[in-house]
Regions:
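Active-site helical microenvironments for divalent-metal-assisted chemistry
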Residues: 1-279, 284-288
Length: 288
């Protein structure tokens, strides 16, 4: 008996080139040395073919979005299954690809993660009441039986915030406020500090553009002395760890603009009264 298999367009796609996926694969391999990337490369091929001809509001090829989301996810250290799901997170909602197709080609885990993200995409929030916002955050967590769903959703929101300028002004305001009320606190709850900081700064730039520009300029004016101080501080901490025989990683960073804005507006401080413009993070294997 001859079995006729439906020939899907993404199965006719040639393998992805190294150039097309280099940034994503570099991020993934930097955290998973020697890991197999076949699943990620196949997911890219499917996403590229499925979104062929589609563009975003900005006019750029749609594939740029799932690629960016997957790169953010890879930067968080997630496994190949999660990165593959990130590449495919819009495929079911926006293309002919079905959940059954994903399960057949990528397995049950990818199907469940993509299904979870698709369901979250259908939720919309329109309140600024903190109690209701807290309830919505709890609902998002409850609906995400797998935390990887939330991580992809946060990465999706981060890239959408980075490209927010393509939307009409009223939508920019709504999305930015929703980001501040719902998604930034969720990122903080999951320990995704870098994502949380970026979400808050991007939301601030949209909600209070003049204040954002003023603070950004003041921070830039101080950047030479700040960078010198930060380098010295990191060096001192690294030296002290070495003296004590403690293995660890030390990372310094400028404080986010949102935290400076909070101190100036909420606590009524002037910029000159804010001295903690840098932060240092020390990561060790264990704490005694």
């Amino acid at each position: 008996m001859v079995t006729v298999t439906r020939v899907l367009p993404w199965r006719r796609r040639p393998r992805a080139t190294v150039e097309e996926t280099s940034t994503l694969l570099t991020e993934f391999r930097s955290r998973h040395v020697g890991a197999d990337t076949t699943l990620i490369e196949r997911a890219y091929e499917v996403a590229l073919a499925a979104h062929a001809g589609q563009t975003r509001k900005s006019g750029e090829p749609y594939i740029n979005h799932p690629m960016s989301v997957a790169t953010i996810v890879a930067r968080q250290g997630l496994d190949d299954t999660t990165v593959a799901a990130a590449l495919l997170h819009d495929a079911v909602e926006d293309t002919p690809v079905s959940l059954d197709d994903l399960e057949r080609d990528f397995g049950t885990e990818v199907r469940l993660i993509v299904d979870g993200v698709t369901k979250l995409d259908r939720l919309h929030f329109d309140t600024r009441e903190e109690q209701q916002a807290a309830s919505m955050r709890k609902m998002l967590v409850a609906l995400s039986k797998d935390l990887r769903v939330l991580i992809i959703k946060l990465a999706d929101r981060l890239h959408n915030m980075r490209t927010l300028a393509a939307l009409p002004e009223h939508k920019q305001q709504r999305v930015a406020q929703e980001t501040m009320d719902i998604y930034a606190p969720l990122a903080n709850r999951l320990g995704m500090q870098e994502v949380k900081d970026q979400l808050q700064d991007l939301a601030l730039a949209t909600l209070h553009p003049k204040r954002y520009s003023q603070i950004d300029q003041m921070v830039q004016d101080r950047s030479p002395e700040r960078d010198l101080y930060l380098a010295q501080l990191v060096g001192e901490v690294e030296g002290r760890l070495a003296e004590l025989g403690i293995a660890g990683r030390v990372a310094g960073r400028p404080k986010q603009l949102w935290s400076i804005y909070e101190k100036m507006i909420v606590k009524g401080r002037s910029f000159d009264e804010i001295h903690d413009l840098v932060g240092v993070r020390v990561i060790v294997d264990s704490v005694r």
